[in-house]
Amino acid sequence: MPGKMGKVVQVIGPVIDIKFDSDSLPDLYNAIVIKAGDYELVAEVEQHVGDDIVRTIAMSATEGLKRGMDAVDTGAPISVPVGEEVLGRLFNVLGKPIDKCGDIEVKQEYPIHRPAPSFKDQSVEPEMFETGIKVVDLLAPYQRGGKIGLFGGAGVGKTVLIQELINNIAKQHGGLSVFTGVGERSREGNDLYHEMRESGVIDKTALVFGQMNEPPGARMRVALTGLTMAEYFRDKGQDVLLFIDNIFRYTQAGSEVSALLGRTPSAVGYQPTLATEMGALQERITSTVNGSITSVQAVYVPADDLTDPAPATTFAHLDATTVLSRGIAELGIYPAVDPLESTSRILDPRIVGEEHYKVAADVKHVLEKYKQLQDIIAILGVDELGDEDKAVVARARRIQRFLSQPFTVGEQFTGLKGKYVPVKETVRGFKEILEGKYDELPESAFLFAGTIDDVIEKAKKLG
């Protein structure tokens, strides 16, 4: 049976008003298909305006759209394919393949608007998730089934860190990943896709993109498309990694849509529904008794201001934060993770163990002391410090460099072979540095090394 028929009566950019009979108005969030010859566009109902008009947001560019075109209510929200068939493929917001590898055989579809799991279905067992990245595993460990935020300004390495995590998860854990590109550069998405094909991790990953050049409707909904695909695997008992790059663009697209729909903006020009929209997405990203979704979300921080409403609203939902610092990047230390700003809820002796907790606390203490001494060093120089403070500075500089690490995904740029460091090795390395075992080794030996054994090898070569 064909759906309810309507006609396009107004087009203002991505906002389309469609007139239906007053007794057959489509429900909110229903998908509407506008067709004329070869032209086809999908829009989502956002508002009912008056008795017989619905206001919709287009999911693709509206060039070629005219008043008077026929529109059909599909009777359901946008639905996307789920299941094993989506692995290794690249999709748009509507779940259509965009990798030119042919259609997929759709066995099952889920609507992108779904309720979050109920309390009784949720799992609350805290467990550490090993990433193989030293600075993360030691100082701000990730929780299996947790939500992690990657905070940083433009160009400090958020996307590279995400790519390394995808690589490590696929190769070391054999886990499935869903990568959602929300409002980021198409070039980066293209590079990621080809790198994943070359490295062979693509078979364990589904990619969903709604990039910078797409209308706000697509950028606002593409995160839900990726999440829906991840939910299917979780409900089938698997551990999934959901990457969202960038969650700020989700908020930004929501802000554009809100303004287009005529809502009064709230603080800093953001949408009044900012917290509600963020909650609707984040509450669905959770672990159940069946399986888990661990999500890593890159968070662009406008003008490096962490108090901006977009990053501040995101903070409330996170279990761990990895803060990338421009100051550390300027020192040439990568990943440029700020060891003192990054936090984790599970850095707790009952979860990570007594030894790990103590080593992490001592590393932070030494780095904190070094930070306090930097003003004195800048004015008077290192020679004016007491012997104890000199030892702290020397050790802190070695720790700072040992927190760097060569990445597999950066091999073609750095010429250094990427290293995956198990958490036991990470703890042992930092413990021995704190004990003063390597005070005589040159600082440069600690930079871009994997384990502490690599440092010793490097020091021998440096002679």
From Swiss-Prot:
Family the UniProt entry places it in: Belongs to the ATPase alpha/beta chains family.
Membrane protein topology class: Peripheral membrane protein
CDD domains linked to this entry: ATP-synt_F1_beta_C, ATP-synt_F1_beta_N, F1-ATPase_beta_CD
Annotated function: Produces ATP from ADP in the presence of a proton gradient across the membrane. The catalytic sites are hosted primarily by the beta subunits.
Protein name: ATP synthase subunit beta
GO molecular function, one term: proton-transporting ATP synthase activity, rotational mechanism
UniProt entry keywords in alphabetical sequence: ATP synthesis, ATP-binding, Cell membrane, CF(1), Hydrogen ion transport, Ion transport, Membrane, Nucleotide-binding, Translocase, Transport
Annotated PANTHER family: ATP SYNTHASE, ATP SYNTHASE SUBUNIT BETA, MITOCHONDRIAL
Record text on subunit structure and interactions: F-type ATPases have 2 components, CF(1) - the catalytic core - and CF(0) - the membrane proton channel. CF(1) has five subunits: alpha(3), beta(3), gamma(1), delta(1), epsilon(1). CF(0) has three main subunits: a(1), b(2) and c(9-12). The alpha and beta chains form an alternating ring which encloses part of the gamma chain. CF(1) is attached to CF(0) by a central stalk formed by the gamma and epsilon chains, while a peripheral stalk is formed by the delta and b chains.
Domain of life of the organism encoding this protein: Bacteria
One Gene Ontology CC term in the entry: plasma membrane
Compartment(s) where it occurs, according to its Swiss-Prot or TrEMBL record: Cell membrane
Reaction(s) this enzyme catalyzes, per UniProt: ATP + H2O + 4 H(+)(in) = ADP + phosphate + 5 H(+)(out)
Xref: HAMAP family: ATP_synth_beta_bact (MF_01347)
PROSITE patterns, sorted: ATPASE_ALPHA_BETA
EC number: 7.1.2.2
Residue numbers binding ATP: G152, G153, A154, G155, V156, G157, K158, T159
